Curated annotation (Swiss-Prot):
Lineage: Eukaryota, Viridiplantae, Streptophyta, Embryophyta, Tracheophyta
Expressed in which tissues: Specifically expressed in roots.
Superkingdom per UniProt: Eukaryota
GO cellular component: membrane
Required co-factors: heme
Organism: Solanum lycopersicum
E.C. number: 1.14.14.126
Protein known as: Beta-amyrin 28-monooxygenase
Similarity annotation: Belongs to the cytochrome P450 family.
Gene3D superfamilies linked to this entry: Cytochrome P450 (1.10.630.10)
Oxidoreductase among keywords: yes
Enzyme class: oxidoreductase
Length: 476
């Protein structure tokens, strides 16, 4: 009897221990929040806040409700914690590939199948080997003239001799043309146009519910990616021939560099791998920049005093150039106020709304337990539109970026840490060259004064930002 009693006590202690362990793993110590509907979680609320033009509402409502800068939810089929604020940004960016790693939804992995064959850390190392020189400021200097030339052609064909234009399709064409030229040395407008339409279909369905049925955005995105990939493989095969025959330079663009770079074992990437990586770069170098350029036009149209200061700065540079003389790196460095304006646009309408990470192990943050495998979402708006980081956050004020600028980890349109966008300086160049030729040629006004903004996944004007143009009476 006594032995039975001891056994029962041992079983009871064991069961209590299991229960306590289960509680820790399944809820106790987790951030506050709810997981929403089965399967969908809170994904529809998360996405619909963007469709309504206020993606920050999903974040701010829950921060206020739970009185916490960390909360749990269920997004895109995954249990997730949302991290908000500068300290959260610092924690995530500082622990990249230690406690967390980049994570993409299944829709992205299915569009880029090669990304599932290696770890996120290995992919990051590969890409940084592939792009050691192209995006460095000293390397980008030699591309300023090419950017200037293409930008002039863009305005000549898409803007000049028109009373009205729709801005967003034009900025998409502009940034895509630049990316094709500088990444692939593809410059023929007909060849670029062949990529452009399927590329738009791909971008719009990339972050979507991964239902692969005919007619769904995800299904259309997969078809578009397959078409683009075949075209890229054709370009890659021809480039290999041209490199072998010495017809092209080994350093003329990213494609040549990728073809000639091997890993530590002497292995070169296959054609499909390179096509996937070029495709990813085209998305990063095209969609985000086109959104940024469109919103720069929007704010310049709404704020005449800001436009006038940008115009004055750019005309001083224009007047220093001889007939037909292209912009140079030194001219870009003089565009300080223009870049402050661009940064304020990136604060108020960041093309990158946020990004996901995956917990590599259990860890604690702000007193909360984050289990291994959970997804973590950081939001740019959690600092960009908070009074404590940017006083009067809805006010357009480029002076925020004068001197030392915003506090660390508060202005994050390009991410941060090891995963910071490698094309940050490239984006600065294409944005400033665009601003130079825009204000040098035109004054303009919005045709729809209160046009709705949609965020899906980047902010875009619902009607494309129709504009009425008033050309300046001087030679551009």
């Amino acid at each position: 009897m006594e032995l039975l009693y001891v056994c029962l006590v041992c079983v009871f202690v064991f069961l209590v221990s299991l229960l306590l362990l289960y509680k820790k793993k399944s809820g106790e110590g987790l951030p506050p929040g709810k997981t929403g509907w089965p399967v969908f979680g809170e994904s529809l609320e998360f996405l619909s806040s963007g469709w309504k033009g206020h993606p920050e509402k999903f974040i701010f409502d829950r921060v206020a409700k739970y009185s916490s800068s960390v909360f749990k939810t269920h997004l895109l089929g995954e249990e997730a914690a949302v991290f908000c604020g500068a300290s959260a940004n610092k924690f995530l960016f500082s622990n990249e590939n230690k406690l967390v790693q980049a994570w993409w939804p299944n829709s992205v992995n299915k569009v880029f199948p090669s990304s599932t064959q290696t770890s996120s850390k290995e992919e990051a190392i590969k890409m940084r080997k592939m792009l050691p020189n192209f995006f460095k400021p000293e390397a980008l200097q030699r591309y300023v003239g090419i950017m200037d030339h293409i930008t002039q052609r863009h305005f000549a064909t898409g803007w000049e001799n028109k009373e009205q234009v729709v801005v967003f399709p034009l900025t998409k064409r502009y940034t895509f043309w630049l990316a094709c030229r500088l990444f692939l040395s593809v410059e023929d407008p007909k060849h670029v146009a062949k990529f452009a339409d399927p590329f738009d279909v791909l971008a719009s369905g990339l972050i979507s519910i991964p239902i692969d049925l005919p007619g769904t955005p995800f299904n259309r995105a997969i078809k578009a990616s397959n078409f683009i990939r075949k075209e890229l493989v054709r370009i890659i095969k021809q480039r290999k021939i041209d490199l072998g025959e010495g017809k092209v330079s080994s350093t003329q663009d990213i494609l040549s560099h990728m073809l000639l770079t091997c890993d530590e074992n002497g292995k070169f990437l296959g054609d499909l791998d390179i096509a996937d990586k070029i495709l990813g770069l085209l998305i990063g170098g095209h969609d985000t920049a086109s959104s940024a350029c469109s919103f720069i036009v929007k704010y310049l149209a709404e704020l005449p005093h800001i436009y006038q200061r940008v115009y004055t700065e750019q005309m001083e540079i224009a007047k220093s150039k001889g007939p037909g003389e292209l912009l140079r790196w030194e001219d870009i460095q003089k565009m300080k106020y223009s870049w402050n304006v661009a940064c304020e646009v990136l604060r108020l309408a960041p093309p990158l709304q946020g990004a996901f990470r995956e917990a590599l192990s259990d860890f604690m943050f702000n007193g909360f337990y984050i289990p291994k495998g959970w997804k973590i979402y950081w939001s740019a708006n959690s600092t960009h539109k908070r009074e404590e980081f940017f006083p009067d956050p809805e006010k357009f004020d480029p002076s925020r970026f004068e001197g030392s600028g915003p506090a660390p980890y508060t202005f994050v349109p390009f991410g941060g840490g090891p995963r910071m966008c490698p094309g940050k300086e490239y984006a600065r160049l294409e944005i400033l060259v665009f601003m130079h030729h825009l204000v040098k040629r035109f004054k303009f006004e919005k045709i729809i004064p209160h046009e709705k903004i949609i965020v899906n996944p980047m902010p875009i004007p619902a009607n494309g930002l129709p504009l009425r143009l008033y050309p300046h009476h001087h030679n551009p």
